[in-house]
């Protein structure tokens, strides 16, 4: 089955209807899951005919892929446009990341992708490339501004895991509802921890260190 979200050649499609379809798909699939959510339900939610959906998206799988890409749009990268020093931008980025992934729809999206891992294996890769991989690359870039660039990729991976920590697992598993203050504490602890690692700081570890308030 093709997963291309491109319309058939020769058709001029209304971008407003495409946006409405994606919003309808978001509501249906986040409520019912990818397997149980139907195209009929998406059409009703979006206020369009089912044939209109298929003019924009060749299949249900193509619609699911387009929705995942849209929901992984890198809004978390907003702090990069700030004029703050790199350490503060890094902290802001991690706070934005935590707030984003802890949102109800983000948690539902992650659960839905895991649930479909066997049936739609490409979905996990799409999610990874559209979201987590980009975030880690930007964290590595920020870290490298003041630290050893060679360690930046592994530091970025560890910072994400430490910043989200057990609080995110509780959200995904439905065993708790940690608030933003929990994530903020985890983030500050994570930043303090990596700053204590001389190798992560690189050859200039004995010199002035970046100032991050913990």
Task: Give, region by region, the residue ranges found by the protein language model.
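Key DNA-contact positions within bacterial/archaeal DNA-binding proteins
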Residues: 51
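N-terminal intrinsically disordered/low-complexity leader segments
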Residues: 1-16, 198-214
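Hydrophobic/aromatic-rich alpha-helical bundle segments in the mid-to-C-terminal region
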Residues: 144-191, 202-205, 209-214
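Amphipathic alpha-helical packing segments from all-alpha helical-bundle domains
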Residues: 88, 104-108, 121-147, 153-157, ...
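Helix-loop "lid/cap" segments that line or gate small-molecule binding pockets
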Residues: 95-102, 110-119, 190-194
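Amphipathic alpha-helical linker/stalk segments
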Residues: 31, 65-94, 99-101
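Short loop-to-helix capping motifs
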Residues: 59, 116-121, 165
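Basic, helix-initiating cap at the start of DNA-binding domains
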Residues: 1-48, 56, 61-62
